[in-house]
Amino acid sequence: MDAEVTLFSKPEELIAWADTFDILLNPSIEDAAILLNYMEGHDYAIGIDSDGKMYRQDVAEENGEIEPYPIDDVIDIVCEWNYELILDAEAHRSDPKDFNDYNEYQSRYESLKADEKRLDRLFDKTSYGKELIEVATELADRVIAQLGNKELEKVAVTVAEGVREYSTGKRGR
């Protein structure tokens, strides 16, 4: 890897990058902090080269691997990790050792669900989120065409929303 990569250490750095290279993303401080914290929690850091291209570095090892890693992939993997952590917290709170254990995992679960809402909004702005909405709309349009009933236009909205809710609630696709 020949490119010199500058790793982000603060949410403001990610926001500054987005303001220049991905203005539609428009992350808040909290959004950027969530992305950076999840990456750090999984032993990765993200950064950019002098052209603004984003990279991911494995920070678990000295001189860890650096690879091109677009922001859409960052958001997607963070959504997946969030989903896995929600499942883990849900399992622990469903079978706690004691009341303190329950409270700990309930608090963790609520925090992860709050992260999920922010991540879902970010995911919708990615190429993956846009593609999912297009697929859902196309599917709904086909259903309406096959049934031939104009009254069923409401079905299109329902199906599109259902697919969207399913996909954002079921990370790890």
Which stretches of residues belong to each language-model region?
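Short, extreme N-terminal segment that most often corresponds to the first beta-strand
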Residues: 1-21
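Hydrophobic, Leu/Ile/Phe/Ala-enriched alpha-helical segments that form helix-helix packing faces
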Residues: 18-22, 35-43, 163, 167
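Acidic, low-complexity, intrinsically disordered interaction modules
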Residues: 25-133, 139
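Composition-driven recognition of long, low-complexity, acid-poor segments enriched in small hydrophobic
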Residues: 129-147, 151-166
